[in-house]
């Protein structure tokens, strides 16, 4: 199931917010630059598979949860 960069970025931003992390904290935990996290959340960057694994681990979520498309009619807030 392929999601757009914008959908993936939104999923990561939601997971980060739910975890109570700043972009800087997530970047540090995932071994990425803060600018990369910001670009990712804006839908301007698609992470490599190893980066996605590190992000999911840092966020304590399954990689597939980040890659799932919302169901039709599902409101994302």
Task: Show which residues each predicted segment covers.
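Residue-level detection of the helix-turn-helix DNA-binding "recognition helix"
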Residues: 17, 31, 42-44, 71
């Amino acid at each position: 199931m392929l999601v757009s960069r914008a959908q993936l970025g939104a999923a990561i931003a939601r997971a980060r917010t739910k975890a109570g992390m700043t972009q800087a904290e997530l970047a540090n935990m995932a071994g990425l630059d803060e600018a990369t996290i910001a670009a990712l959340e804006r839908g301007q960057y698609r992470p490599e598979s190893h980066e996605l694994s590190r992000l999911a681990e840092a966020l304590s979520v399954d990689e597939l949860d980040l890659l799932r498309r919302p169901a039709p009619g599902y409101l994302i807030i």
